[in-house]
Swiss-Prot record:
InterPro entries: A-amylase/branching_C, Branching_enzy, GlgB, GlgB_N, GlgB_N_E_set_prok, Glyco_hydro_13_cat_dom, Glyco_hydro_13_N, Glyco_hydro_b. GO terms for molecular function: 1,4-alpha-glucan branching enzyme activity; cation binding; hydrolase activity, hydrolyzing O-glycosyl compounds. This is 1,4-alpha-glucan branching enzyme GlgB. The gene is glgB. It holds the Pfam family Alpha-amylase_C. Belongs to the glycosyl hydrolase 13 family. GlgB subfamily. Keywords: Carbohydrate metabolism, Glycogen biosynthesis, Glycogen metabolism, Glycosyltransferase, Transferase. It catalyses: Transfers a segment of a (1->4)-alpha-D-glucan chain to a primary hydroxy group in a similar glucan chain. It comes from the Bacteria. NCBIfam families: branching_enzym, PRK05402.1, PRK12313.1. Signal peptide: none annotated.
Length: 729
């Protein structure tokens, strides 16, 4: 195909071989492709004088001229005439070296992916008084026959700015004058010349919402962070610190007034409303359902397309930085859900990016997820591995987030996950472990903890895969923490039973301690447990209205007593009646009722108690911090445990009664003589409890009980958990 037709039909693979300034022995040639131009002059920008005119080639939009006198200009512009008048543009095709710079080091370090690819704002220092502001575009499309950058700056015309293909499958171009805020996409032709749906930038930093889904050029260097004090505070051992996580879907935590005409609160409005609430409630961390840009609201963010762009539903990238910054200035850590397991088929996204399987496994037995109707990343492909690890580092680097909760880890680890016998491909050893995904997760964790030792990674992993939260050098996956899905499943199953039947399920509340120290666990009552017909946490509880609330309070306090960091989804803390709906707000009006405000008050006090008493958090992941005092009283459905700090310096007993029967003069074995005091009783009237009488201070006597030399007699309220502090002799 002739060059003119290649350019006209956006089918030019190597424009640098034809356009721009090309030197010969004793001359230089300048060639331009400017659709709809009627004339072009070449302006030497060093002198701002014309050095000649380009001649149209055979009534085409291709213009060229050979210059046999003088030296080539260091940098030049075109004075273009067309039917509407004239304008000046700086020729993109003279900056070939600067364009190639994007891919010189991209494979060396994961961070280079977001520092070199995508739309990078650069200053071209070409000897002028002021550098030329430009944007360097670089995108990976190894099997495309042609790629053009299209956007506001060229009227979305794919014939205007063909990109240059490099030896490594990247396409590059520097475009002067493209600035922050300009919208763009890539027009890609597959290997056969067929035009694909216009693609958003895989490394785009900002994205528009439906219907355009366009990428937006963004400058990451403008925001001035104010969280230095926080960065100093977070140094330390995460395993011995209190961690109470409030899991939030930003789009439905609270909605604007219906008369505002807005669908969502903005990041700035969430700063004003969400942060004070979280701080007042005593949570240490926010965990946000996926922030990466996603097209479908109903996916809650778990079908992301723009991995490097915070969703613009609530504002721009700097607005999200401000949100994180303000969280830190208020002493709140920020964890984001991160989704490296799969991605959706949306036409503007990664699926068949250049007409081939660039990002996903080609074989559908590995590359298609039957549960979510989505594509699975090719975890064995170097460019994909770099892309994903880079994205993990990106959020820690550019947005200062404190941790990543990695979604759907089990689906990555197992080749036969949710597949029938004939629907999966064994690994090289004939097994079902995905070695490529395993090594990717190990690499990601090593990179995160190497560059950001104060950060944390948390795995949502629902199987018994070994050493998920153990270091890679010990043969583990390298995560900092793992969700304890077993505890969640067993304890919710138990608490949903009528109290009269709980005696037959007693082991469901104690079995978790058999494996409690195999991993570094987070106890999660997450969004997954209050959707899809499962009902709200309150509605899982049996009994009448009072018993449901009492069961929830008893269960919540048992969770805070149990070893492991804590996570609760929004709405749990007010005893929301309806299950979560992403299209509407939490039912905040329920706080007008004592039942719900009482539950909220309990969660607030549990967070305070958990943070203030080292016995309840310091040894969450050390067997020395826990002892069953009585875990065998199935007949009365009671449980008693001891939590203690390092060296036993502080001792807190937790006693739970999972029946509606009050237990007067209930005897509890204790370690030492002396005085004990009630720290918290979930049956107190302030929590909408019955206010069952209870002495605040109790003396131990030398009555052996529960294999202890001493014991105390307490009044154990119905459906309640009581925390008791040993004060000393």
């Amino acid at each position: 195909m002739q060059l003119e037709k290649q350019l006209q039909h956006a089918q030019c693979t190597f424009p640098f071989s034809h356009l721009g300034l090309l030197k010969t022995d004793n001359a230089f040639t300048i060639t331009a492709w400017v659709p709809n131009a009627t004339g072009i002059k070449v302006i030497d920008l060093a002198t701002d004088k014309a050095i000649g005119s380009l001649k149209r080639q055979a009534q085409s939009d291709l213009f060229t001229a050979e210059f046999t006198k003088g030296n080539p200009p260091a940098v030049y512009a075109f004075e273009v005439k067309n039917a509407q008048g004239s304008y000046r543009i700086i020729d993109p095709y003279q900056f070939q070296d600067q364009a190639f710079h994007a891919v010189h080091f991209v494979d060396h370090l994961p961070k280079n992916v977001y520092q070199q690819l995508g739309a990078q704002l650069i200053d071209l220092d070409v000897g002028l008084k002021t550098p030329i502001a430009a944007t360097r575009f670089a995108v990976f499309a190894p099997n495309a026959s042609a790629v053009s950058v299209i956007g506001d700056f060229n009227y979305w015309d794919g014939s205007c700015l063909p990109m240059q293909k490099t030896d490594f499958g990247y396409w590059v171009l520097v475009v002067p004058g493209v600035k922050a805020g300009d919208k763009y996409k890539y027009q890609i032709k597959d290997a056969h010349g067929n035009e694909l749906p216009h693609k958003a930038d895989p490394v785009g930093f900002y994205a528009e919402q439906y219907p355009s889904h366009a990428s937006v050029v963004f400058d990451h260097e403008q925001y001035q962070w104010q969280d230095t004090k926080w960065q100093q505070q977070v140094k330390g051992d995460k395993y011995t610190q209190a961690m109470s996580i409030y899991e939030v879907h930003l789009g439905s935590w609270k909605r604007p007034d219906s008369q505002s005409g807005k669908t969502y609160l903005s990041y700035h409005e969430l700063v004003d409303e969400l942060i004070p609430y979280v701080k007042d409630m005593g949570y240490t961390h926010l965990e946000l359902l996926p922030i990466s840009e996603f097209p479908f609201d109903g996916s809650w963010g778990y079908q992301p397309v723009g991995l490097f762009a915070p969703t613009s539903r609530f504002g721009g990238p700097d607005d999200f930085k401000y949100f994180v910054d303000q969280c830190h200035q208020n002493g709140i850590g920020v964890i984001i859900d991160w989704v490296p397991a799969h991605f959706p088929e949306d036409g503007h996204g990664l699926a068949r990016f250049d007409g081939t399987h660039v990002y996903e496994y080609e074989d559908p037995r590995k590359g298609w997820h039957p549960d979510w109707n989505s594509c699975i990343y090719d975890f064995g492909k170097d460019t994909v591995r770099q892309f994903l690890v880079a994205n993990a580092l990106f959020w820690l680097d550019k947005y200062h987030v404190d941790g990543l909760r990695v979604d759907a880890v089990a689906s990555m680890l197992y080749l036969d996950y949710s597949r029938e016998a004939d629907e999966w491909v064994p690994n090289v050893d004939g097994g079902n472990h995905n070695y490529e995904a395993i090594s990717l997760l190990q690499w990601m964790n090593k990179e995160v903890y190497s560059h950001y030792p104060n950060a944390m990674t948390i795995a949502e992993e629902s199987t018994s895969f070994a050493k998920v939260s153990r270091p890679v050098f010990e043969g583990g996956l390298g995560f900092g923490f793992k969700w304890n899905m077993g505890w969640m499943h067993d304890s919710l199953h138990y608490i949903s039973k009528d109290p009269s039947y709980r005696r037959y399920h007693h082991g469901e509340m104690t079995f978790s301690m058999v494996y409690a120290y195999d991993e570094s666990f987070v106890l999660p009552i997450s969004h997954d447990e209050v959707v899809h017909g499962k009902g709200s946490l309150l509605r899982k509880m049996p009994g009448d209205e009072w018993q449901q609330a009492a069961n929830l309070r008893c269960y919540a306090a048992f969770m805070y007593a149990h070893p492991g960091k804590k996570l609760n989804f929004m709405g749990n803390e007010i005893g929301q009646s309806a299950e979560w709906n992403h299209d509407s707000s939490i039912n905040w009006h329920l706080l007008d009722y004592d039942k719900h405000s009482g539950i909220q008050a309990l969660y607030r006090d549990l967070n305070t108690l958990y943070a203030e008493y080292p016995a309840l958090h310091e040894l969450d992941h050390d067997p020395a911090g826990f002892e069953w005092i009585d875990h065998e009283n199935a007949e009365q459905s009671t449980l008693a445990m001891l939590r203690q700090s390092k060296g036993g310096k502080q001792q807190v007993y937790a006693l739970s009664n999972f029946t509606p029967v009050p237990r007067t003069n209930f005897r509890l074995g204790v370690k030492a003589p002396g005085e004990y005091s009630i720290l918290l009783n979930t049956d107190d009237k302030q929590y909408w409890g019955s206010g069952h009488s209870q002495n605040k201070t109790i003396k131990a006597d030398k009555t052996p009980w529960n294999n202890q030399a001493y014991s105390i007699s307490v009044s154990l309220p119905p459906l309640a958990t009581v925390f008791i502090l040993y004060k000393g002799q």
